[in-house]
Amino acid sequence: MPQKICLISFDHWNYDKHIVDKLKEKGIDAFHIKIGGFKYKNNAARIANSFSKIVLGKNPKIQKRQEYILEMLEKMGVQDQILVINPEVISVEYHLKIKKYTQKYSAYLYDSVSRCPVDHLLEGVFDEIYSFDKDDVKKYGFKETTNYNYLEKQPITSPDLIKNQALYIASFDNR
């Protein structure tokens, strides 16, 4: 029986979908809960959400997205592993509910803790937290990993065929 892995992420640009595709290529029963894929049921729900945000200062869509995650997990059943990318967009309360659907609950941080705080998620929520930020790995004891790139390898182009005159690579940190 193949391992069951669920990926939960916002995935604005369909970048994380490629992770699930690669897992499936390896024979893993993988599925993606795309939080950004949540849609209002109708225009009345959209108007009610806008009213709540403007008048009450509360955004019901945030809670509905989290309920959507639980609905999808209820439908798909218990998973061998669940990986959440950018866990700060989900409340602790919902993380603890999600965790009941798996034996191994992990998080991957797309950014440093200084830019996207996860302090509220450090105690008893995740079995493992992965980060590419060396300072965060050292300070919080996260597991070090790299960023990933879903692009297929391309053959090296002959220098004679290169038309660009410049290449610029930058990083704002100390690397």
Where are these regions (language model features)?
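N-terminal pre-catalytic "stem/leader" segment of glycosyltransferase-like enzymes
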Residues: 1-110, 116, 122, 127-128
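Catalytic core of nucleotide-activated saccharide and alditol-phosphate transferases
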Residues: 95-175
